[in-house]
Amino acid sequence: MFDKAIIEFDKALRTVFAPARSVRPVPGDDVPDAPLDDEQKRHAAALMRVNHVGEICAQALYQGQAIMSGDERVREELQRASHEETEHLAWTEQRIAELGGRKSLLNPLWYGGALAIGMLAGRFGDRWNLGFLAETERQVEAHLTSHLERLPADDRKSRAIVEQMRTDEVEHAETALKLGGRELPLPVRSAMKLASRVMTTAAYRV
């Protein structure tokens, strides 16, 4: 039990503080940088910071859910999704730096809150656990779609990253439902949307 706690704590430290690494090529890495003005760069960096925070939260959610799951198949799916989210973390981190931005100062807070929510979701059983995963991915997909509408049209690098992230999130949601995830009640989905709105608003600025 103590060894497991050390492993989970190490995951948290690496997610929040260590540079993320990607196995897959970074989407748009071969696309030349567009000549964006200072305001466009600031805006794009802020949107990518929001996406980076979303991936921090995803790592914590999946970690919390995996800790509480009693089904090896569910844990494996959570770990697979987590690995892809780590790549998203690396992509957004790189793009933020290229745009001259910075990561959120509140990342430890986002991580801690999402970990607690993930563990709480896991306590309700694997079907609800998977349903929570599916709904999370749907909401992330929706907010990534909105970012494609808000990013500067010429920022093809950021757009390529967001498009690939969205594709991955759709796949995660579909897999969770195929594994038996249940649709969450409307009040729960609404509460998740409200929490997401608070996070995205704060992360855009801080």
From Swiss-Prot:
Its main location: membrane. Its EC number is 1.14.99.60. The keyword Cell membrane applies. The keyword Hydrolase does not apply. It comes from the Bacteria. GO terms for molecular function: 3-demethoxyubiquinol 3-hydroxylase activity; metal ion binding. Its cofactor is Fe cation. Signal peptide: none annotated. Binds 2 iron ions per subunit. Fe cation 2 binds at residues 85, 137, 169, 172. Keywords: Cell membrane, Iron, Membrane, Metal-binding, Monooxygenase, Oxidoreductase, Ubiquinone biosynthesis. It is found in: Cell membrane. InterPro entries: COQ7_proteobact, Ferritin-like, Ferritin-like_SF, Ubq_synth_Coq7. It catalyses: a 5-methoxy-2-methyl-3-(all-trans-polyprenyl)benzene-1,4-diol + AH2 + O2 = a 3-demethylubiquinol + A + H2O. It is a peripheral membrane protein. Fe cation 1 binds at residues 55, 85, 88, 169. One of its GO terms (biological process) is ubiquinone biosynthetic process. Pathway: Cofactor biosynthesis; ubiquinone biosynthesis. GO terms for cellular component: plasma membrane. Pfam families: COQ7. Belongs to the COQ7 family. Catalyzes the hydroxylation of 2-nonaprenyl-3-methyl-6-methoxy-1,4-benzoquinol during ubiquinone biosynthesis. HAMAP family: COQ7. This is 3-demethoxyubiquinol 3-hydroxylase.
